[in-house]
């Protein structure tokens, strides 16, 4: 595995002069700024416009060259359109996810349905938005615990990502600069609790720890790492509920994802940099057509992907590392 540790924030100022804008894109640029609530200083607008135009051209070229109509996979210009590649990586590529051997509680011969969506069973809270803070690891872990809390109590309570960010630093996490789900689960287990979003709301920046035990709404007794193969992941998902996973999310095609079954030829299974929640699986078309997918909840808001979710190839040799770093808690 190639480790990816911590990246420095890219300064907004760029030394090189921005190229002259393509005035044919003026109306599209103004509409994009309006719909994404962007305002800039005059100098910054030149730089951001240049980046945005480059991304527009890349998306058009990528669609033309790669035939993204396959499996209905599409990309689009979204809220990340004025960000450089390095800036987009800041949202994901903040910590390496070391591969771990796993073991999990497994029922004998669990019945595997042809499709599964834990959202329909009430296990999944609404999609949230991490913003410019690289806290995907915390969103993935809290969402996973939320599902187990619902399974145990029947109550679906959004948990505090901010609590996890602020208070798990001594376990190796870095707030908005990244963290590992294993360390986050370890904190919640040892801490004896985690607050709800309602009492410890998300602020998209790390602060000092303000956890109060009397406001805790959940405890984690232990947690399990799933063996690194898709069959074990499938069994764990069916048996236990939503699973915290990590994938290679470093590519522009990921940040520009709109819908369909994701396809990225450069996606790796041993370089993991983005945490998500695995909530189900299914297939497009007929089951015999081998267009199977995993269904994942992201933390980029509902305007990204399929209302905040994405489909990743299933049964394709651990595509993008979907089964390389999966875990879930027991309450």
UniProtKB/Swiss-Prot annotation:
Tissue: Expressed in placenta. Expressed in parietal and spiral artery-associated trophoblast giant cells, most abundantly during the phase of trophoblast invasion. From 14.5 dpc onwards, expressed at lower levels in labyrinth trophoblast cells. Expressed in trophoblast stem cells. Expressed in heart, liver and testis.
Parts of the chain that traverse the membrane: none
Gene Ontology molecular function: any one: cysteine-type peptidase activity
Described purpose of this protein according to its UniProt entry: Involved in trophoblast cell proliferation and differentiation probably by affecting mitotic cell cycle progression. Proteolytic activity and nuclear localization are essential for its role in cell cycle progression.
Disulfide bonds: 133-176, 167-209, 267-320
Identification of the protein by name: Cathepsin 7
EC number(s) reported in the record: 3.4.22.-
Leader sequence residues: 1-17
InterPro entries: Papain-like_cys_pep_sf, Pept_cys_AS, Pept_his_AS, Peptidase_C1A, Peptidase_C1A_C, Peptidase_C1A_papain-like, Prot_inhib_I29
Native source organism of the sequence: Mus musculus (Mouse)
GO CC annotation: endosome; extracellular region; Golgi apparatus; lysosome; nucleus; perinuclear region of cytoplasm
GO process terms (BP): cell division; mitotic cell cycle; negative regulation of mitotic cell cycle; proteolysis; trophoblast giant cell differentiation
Keyword Thylakoid: no
Motif (Nuclear localization signal): 33-50
Keywords carried by this UniProt record: Cell cycle, Cell division, Cytoplasm, Disulfide bond, Endosome, Glycoprotein, Golgi apparatus, Hydrolase, Lysosome, Mitosis, Nucleus, Protease, Secreted, Signal, Thiol protease, Zymogen
Record keyword Mitochondrion present: no
Cited CDD domains: Peptidase_C1A
Residues glycosylated per entry: 72
Gene3D superfamilies the UniProt entry points to: Cysteine proteinases
Positions of the pro-segment in this chain: 18-111
Taxonomic superkingdom: Eukaryota
